[in-house]
From Swiss-Prot:
This is Lipid-A-disaccharide synthase. It comes from the Bacteria. Coiled coil: none annotated. It comes from Vibrio cholerae serotype O1 (strain ATCC 39315 / El Tor Inaba N16961). SUPFAM superfamilies: UDP-Glycosyltransferase/glycogen phosphorylase (SSF53756). InterPro entries: Glyco_trans_19 (IPR003835). Its EC number is 2.4.1.182. It catalyses: a lipid X + a UDP-2-N,3-O-bis[(3R)-3-hydroxyacyl]-alpha-D-glucosamine = a lipid A disaccharide + UDP + H(+). Pathway: Bacterial outer membrane biogenesis; LPS lipid A biosynthesis. It holds the Pfam family LpxB. Keywords: Glycosyltransferase, Lipid A biosynthesis, Lipid biosynthesis, Lipid metabolism, Transferase.
Length: 379
C-alpha cells in the first residue's frame, strides 16, 4: 500500500471516544501515518481524527429525544454515506452507538466498503432477531465478552472476542488502603460502598431502599461506614433528598467521582445493575445487586430477556455468583440479609473466582481490535 491507511470511524458518546483513542493508538503503532475520518470525540480528535460532525450530534438518549432529532440524524447519516462513497476508506469502524452506526454500516457495506461494528449490542440478552440486521450490516463484529462470540458463532456471523478494555485498565490486585487514603476514609473501619445508579430513574427507584438498608445495617454493625459514589450534581441532589427523608441521622460520605475508587476502598458493595457490577468484579469486591424499574418496563423485560441473570458477573460465569435482588425482591429486608451475609463471610472463594474471570477477559483489547481490523483489510 503506497498511500496511507485510511479508516472511517464514528463514535456517538464519551465511552466510545475512549475506545476510539485506544484503537487509533494501536493502529498507529503499526501504521504511523494512518488517517482516521468520520466522527470522533475529544480524545480521538486530539490524535488527529478528522471529524466531519460533532459527536454531540449523536449523543441522544430516550425515544422522545431521538424522535425530535431524527431529521438531523438522518441528514448526518446521508452526508457520511455520501462522503465515504466518494472517498472510500480501507475499512469503516462503527464504535457502539448501534442505532446510528448499524444503519450507516449497512449503507456502506452495500456500497462495497468493508465494515466493522466495535462493541456488540446486547442481542444475546433481548431482541435476538437483531442478529440478522447486524449480519447484513457488517463484515465483522468485535465483542468484549466470550459468550457474545459464542452467540454470533451460532448464527455464523463473523465475530472476534477481543477481551474487555475495563479488564485491561484495572490491575489484577487493587489497593484498598491507598483508595481509603485518597478518599480520606478511616482506614480501620469497615466500609460499605453504596452505588444507587448513574441515571435519574435508577436513583429514584433505589436511593430510598438502599438508605433504609444502611439504617438497618448501622444498628447491627455500629462500626460500619457508608461511602456513596455520585456521578454528577443531579444525582447528588437526588440522593441527598432521599437521605433527608429516610434517615437524616445516618452518616454517609458522598464522593463526586466515578465508582472505581469508592469500590476499591470498600469491604462490600451494594449496587444497581450495570457495567459497574463488572467493574466491582474486576476490583474483587463482594457485592449485592439491587434493581427496580417501573412496572411496564419490568413486564416487557420479563418477556424479552433471554438470560437467566441481569448482572455481567453472573452472565459471564453462567451461575449466580452474585446475589441479584430484582423488582419485588429488592426489599430492605432482603438487601440487609444479603449484605450482612457478605460482611460475615471471608468471601475468598468468590474473590478467587473473580480473579480467574478477570484473566479470561484480559487480552489487551486495543491491540486485539487493531489486529482484527487489519486482518479484515488484508483479506
Amino acid at each position: 500500500m503506497n498511500r496511507p491507511l485510511r479508516i472511517g470511524i464514528v463514535v456517538g458518546e464519551l465511552s466510545g471516544d475512549t475506545l476510539g483513542e485506544g484503537f487509533i493508538k494501536a493502529i498507529r503503532a503499526r501504521y504511523p501515518d494512518a488517517e482516521f475520518v468520520g466522527i470522533g470525540g475529544p480524545k480521538m480528535n486530539a490524535l488527529g481524527c478528522q471529524s466531519l460532525f460533532d459527536m454531540e450530534e449523536l449523543a441522544v438518549m430516550g425515544l422522545v429525544e431521538v424522535l425530535g432529532r431524527l431529521p438531523r440524524l438522518l441528514k448526518v447519516k446521508a452526508e457520511l454515506v455520501k462522503y465515504f462513497t466518494a472517498n472510500p476508506p480501507d475499512v469503516f469502524v462503527g464504535i457502539d452507538a448501534p442505532d446510528f452506526n448499524l444503519r450507516l454500516e449497512l449503507s456502506l457495506k452495500q456500497a462495497g466498503i468493508k465494515t466493522v461494528h466495535y462493541v456488540s449490542p446486547s442481542v444475546w440478552a433481548w431482541r435476538q432477531n437483531r442478529i440478522h440486521g447486524i449480519a447484513a450490516a457488517t463484515h465483522l463484529v468485535l465483542a468484549f465478552l466470550p459468550f457474545e462470540k459464542a452467540f454470533y458463532d451460532k448464527f455464523n456471523v463473523p465475530c472476534e472476542f477481543i477481551g474487555h478494555t475495563l479488564a485491561d485498565s484495572i490491575p489484577l490486585a487493587s489497593d484498598k488502603l491507598a483508595a481509603r487514603q485518597l478518599l480520606g476514609l478511616d482506614e480501620q473501619r469497615r466500609w460499605l460502598a453504596v452505588l444507587p445508579g448513574s441515571r435519574g430513574s435508577e436513583m429514584k427507584m433505589l436511593a430510598e431502599p438502599f438508605i433504609a438498608t444502611c439504617q438497618k445495617l448501622q444498628a447491627r454493625y455500629p462500626d460500619l461506614g457508608f461511602v456513596v459514589a455520585l456521578v454528577n450534581a443531579k444525582r447528588r441532589a437526588q440522593f441527598e433528598q432521599a437521605w433527608q427523608q429516610v434517615a437524616p441521622e445516618l452518616n454517609f460520605v458522598l464522593v463526586d467521582d466515578t465508582a472505581r475508587n469508592v469500590i476499591t476502598a470498600a469491604d462490600a458493595v451494594m449496587l444497581a445493575s450495570g457495567t459497574v457490577a463488572l467493574e466491582c468484579m474486576l476490583l474483587k469486591r463482594p457485592m449485592v445487586v439491587g434493581y427496580r424499574v417501573n412496572a411496564f418496563t419490568a413486564f416487557l423485560a420479563k418477556r424479552l430477556l433471554k438470560t437467566p441473570y441481569v448482572s455481567l458477573p453472573n452472565i459471564l460465569a453462567g451461575e449466580e455468583l452474585v446475589k441479584e435482588l430484582l423488582q419485588d425482591h429488592c426489599t430492605v429486608d432482603n438487601l440487609y440479609h444479603e449484605v450482612s451475609r457478605l460482611l460475615e463471610s471471608d468471601n475468598q472463594a468468590l474473590m478467587d473466582k473473580f480473579t480467574e474471570m478477570h484473566q479470561w477477559i484480559r487480552k489487551d483489547a486495543d491491540q486485539q481490535a487493531a489486529q482484527a481490523v487489519l486482518h479484515l483489510i488484508q483479506k
